[in-house]
């Protein structure tokens, strides 16, 4: 399966995709360029599939990709992005067989004309 280089070295590209995937899991909606969104879509789809499995090996594989970021909930409790993935997001998509994300085009970005999109969880 091919991938986009995104104008970066492999370690920079992996770090950027980890950050984007973690941000998408936390906020469930991010704005980025079209190329980055298409690339992070495959990462997030695989993470959600791991979350649906729910076993220890899947949790460890997902922990390799996601950043260890704590989220403050409305009820003043904290959880990590990994806990959110295996808790509420995995429950939401138990009946769905893939296609967990949606990409909405916004048009060109003002500064450099790059195609701007919103990627969100369905």
Swiss-Prot record:
GO terms for cellular component: cytosolic large ribosomal subunit. GO terms for molecular function: structural constituent of ribosome. Keywords: Ribonucleoprotein, Ribosomal protein. The keyword Ribosomal protein applies. It comes from the Bacteria. The keyword ATP-binding does not apply. Part of the 50S ribosomal subunit. Contacts protein L32. PANTHER family: LARGE RIBOSOMAL SUBUNIT PROTEIN BL17M (PTHR14413:SF16), RIBOSOMAL PROTEIN L17 (PTHR14413). Belongs to the bacterial ribosomal protein bL17 family. This is Large ribosomal subunit protein bL17. It comes from Staphylococcus aureus (strain NCTC 8325 / PS 47). The gene is rplQ.
């Amino acid at each position: 399966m091919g991938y986009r280089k995104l104008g970066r070295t492999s370690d920079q590209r992996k770090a950027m995709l980890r950050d984007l995937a973690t941000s998408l899991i936390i906020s469930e909606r991010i704005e980025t360029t079209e190329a980055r969104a298409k690339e992070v879509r495959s990462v997030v789809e695989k993470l959600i599939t791991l979350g649906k499995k729910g076993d220890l090996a899947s949790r460890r594989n997902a922990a390799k990709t996601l950043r260890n970021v704590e989220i403050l909930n409305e009820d003043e409790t904290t959880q990590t992005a990994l806990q959110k993935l295996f808790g509420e997001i995995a429950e939401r998509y138990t009946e769905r067989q893939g296609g967990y994300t949606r990409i909405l085009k916004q048009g060109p970005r003002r500064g450099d004309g790059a195609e701007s999109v919103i990627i969100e969880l369905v």
